[in-house]
């Protein structure tokens, strides 16, 4: 018990006691002590090993207040109606419990007194880094976005708070396999030109050339032109919508 190794391990662990770290999330400060961050710590072969389970409840509370991932958004539509979106969708961010644990324990080791939570966010879908942390306008959605009304089969494209384009659309055919999902999503990437590939309802394959492709789901929903389409009626999507 008196070996140099054990004494050094004890010394390194004692270094961590009684520390305080301020965690900054969207300009709000949260103060954590060593005991609130670290449930258990060991020091072996020159490295610390931490269990930060103690922190998880606090991060959950922070996410309940600040995070936007998997939450509904309050939104004013083009028509002026105030709605609440479904919690479905890929857009948003939250603090990762694992990342927060790593950054806060590192701060304790390094003797730093403040950590910025923006480096600990995560998201889902194509971009797992999370989106919208610095966006506070329009209830977290921002002022540049595309709004799609499935009821009106109409799309409105906003840039810096101004509608710069509105157009008729035909959404996915209104069945379980093809209907356009509700919620707030982010554009994953953009391709021009592109080829859309998939299967028709009869099982045959298709490959459609388009000039513009901006997908927003991993299952193939997105914005694109459709030179082959002749039926642009408001009810086309009910039985003759997009794939």
Predicted segments — roles?
Residues 212-216, 220-243:
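Active-site scaffold segments
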Residues 1-208, 212, 229:
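Surface-exposed, secretory/extracytoplasmic low-complexity segments enriched in Ser/Thr/Asn/Gly/Pro
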């Amino acid at each position: 018990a008196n070996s140099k190794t054990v004494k050094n391990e004890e010394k390194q662990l004692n270094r961590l006691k009684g520390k305080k770290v301020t965690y900054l999330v969207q300009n709000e400060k949260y103060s954590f002590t060593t005991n609130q961050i670290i449930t258990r710590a060991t020091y072996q072969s020159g490295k610390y090993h931490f269990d930060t389970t103690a922190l998880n409840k606090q991060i959950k509370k922070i996410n309940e207040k600040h995070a936007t991932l998997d939450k509904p958004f309050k939104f004013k539509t083009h028509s002026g109606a105030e709605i609440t979106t479904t919690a479905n969708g890929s857009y948003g961010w939250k603090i990762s419990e694992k990342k927060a644990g790593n950054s806060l324990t590192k701060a304790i080791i390094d003797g730093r007194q403040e950590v910025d939570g923006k480096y600990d966010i995560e998201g889902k879908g194509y971009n797992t880094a999370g989106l919208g942390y610095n966006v506070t306008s329009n209830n977290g959605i921002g002022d540049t976005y595309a709004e799609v009304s499935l009821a009106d089969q109409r799309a409105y494209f906003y840039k810096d708070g101004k509608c710069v384009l509105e157009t008729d659309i035909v959404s996915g055919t209104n069945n379980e396999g093809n209907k356009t999902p509700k919620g707030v999503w982010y554009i994953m990437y953009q391709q021009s030109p592109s080829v859309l590939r998939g299967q028709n309802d009869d099982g045959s394959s298709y490959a459609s050339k388009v000039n513009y492709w901006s997908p927003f789901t991993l299952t193939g929903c997105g914005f694109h032109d459709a030179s082959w389409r002749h039926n642009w009626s408001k009810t086309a999507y009910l039985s003759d919508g997009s794939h």
